[in-house]
Design a protein with these regions (language model features):
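Hydrophobic structural segments
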Residues: 1-96
Length: 96
């Protein structure tokens, strides 16, 4: 057992992430999330929790009901999954 490893001691590093969110721009938000996930991976974070609706943006009212936005959110989520597959942190992101 490595005394200096918090994981060997039964702990996990968890991060609450605040990042710029761009309303109705899911691919730009995905890039922000992926960049943050890569940084957190280098810091040994096991779980990263992102804001609600961080993929779609929050202050867009009825745009959340538009199929074009929802389709792009699904594509952005797939991009996040693919880009983070080899990274340590479990990512919890918000999407409609």
């Amino acid at each position: 057992m490595n005394f200096h490893s918090l994981y060997d001691q039964g702990f996990a590093r968890v991060a609450a992430v605040a990042l710029p969110v761009h309303p109705a721009r899911p691919f730009e938000n995905a890039r922000e999330i992926i960049d943050a996930a890569r940084e957190l991976d280098t810091r040994g974070v096991a779980m990263a929790i992102f804001p609600e609706l961080c993929v779609s943006g929050y202050a867009i009212d009825d745009l959340l009901l538009q199929d074009v936005l929802l389709d792009n959110v699904e594509k952005a989520l797939a991009t996040i999954v693919e880009a983070s597959a080899d990274l340590l942190p479990l990512l919890i992101v918000g999407a409609p």
